[in-house]
């Protein structure tokens, strides 16, 4: 298995640490707030979210989803959001780059398509962190078994799209 990230992974991982470590200071189901800017999403709430594949928290500054797939997904392109995935369970084939086939705009700055033509296929599995910058088409083409992963969405300026690189695990 390989671990992939972009050239600006340090800033994206910093965003992930800030989002998860400095507190999720908004109101959502299964959270407790201590009044000091720290929010805890309980284990029960997290497990329930993963059972259905639903968001844990969504704010204007970031979103954290408990993502679940049992089969292939839809190709996506986000004009503004960086996606950071952390795979908890399962494995999948992730296609990035290329051209979305029969793409449709589904929301402002969001495009969906049934597939991607000409992209790069990569195997991802438990423990992998994947950072996909805004503007990069991506698609979970094949999913083996239950595929559970955290998704952290960090909005950024559309001009912040960066190239990617690969880091192999030791």
Give residue ranges: language-model regions:
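N-terminal secretory signal peptides that target proteins for export/translocation
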Residues: 1-9
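Bacterial N-terminal signal peptides
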Residues: 11-25
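A short, N-terminal "cap"/entry segment at the start of jelly-roll beta-barrel domains
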Residues: 22-80, 162-170
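His/acidic/aromatic-lined binding-pocket segments of jelly-roll/cupin-type domains
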Residues: 76, 83-86, 121-122, 130
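Short, conserved beta-strand element in jelly-roll/cupin
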Residues: 79-100, 106-115
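Conserved metal-binding segment of the jelly-roll/cupin
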Residues: 123-143
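A short hydrophobic beta-strand segment most commonly corresponding to one strand
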Residues: 145-163
């Amino acid at each position: 298995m390989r671990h992939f990230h972009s050239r600006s992974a340090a800033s994206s991982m910093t965003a992930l640490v800030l989002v998860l470590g400095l507190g999720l200071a908004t109101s959502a189901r299964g959270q407790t707030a201590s009044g000091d800017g720290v929010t805890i999403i309980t284990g029960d709430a997290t497990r329930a979210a993963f059972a259905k594949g639903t968001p844990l928290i969504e704010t204007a500054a970031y979103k954290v989803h408990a993502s679940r797939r049992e089969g292939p997904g839809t190709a996506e392109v986000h004009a503004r959001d960086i996606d950071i995935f952390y795979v908890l369970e399962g494995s999948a084939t992730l296609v990035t780059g290329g051209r979305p086939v029969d793409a449709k705009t589904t929301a402002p700055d969001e495009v969906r398509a049934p597939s991607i033509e000409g992209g790069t296929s990569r195997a991802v599995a438990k423990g992998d962190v994947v950072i996909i910058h805004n503007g990069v088409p991506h698609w979970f083409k094949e999913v083996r078994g239950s595929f559970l992963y955290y998704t952290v969405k960090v909005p950024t300026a559309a001009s912040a799209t960066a190239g990617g690189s690969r880091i192999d695990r030791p």
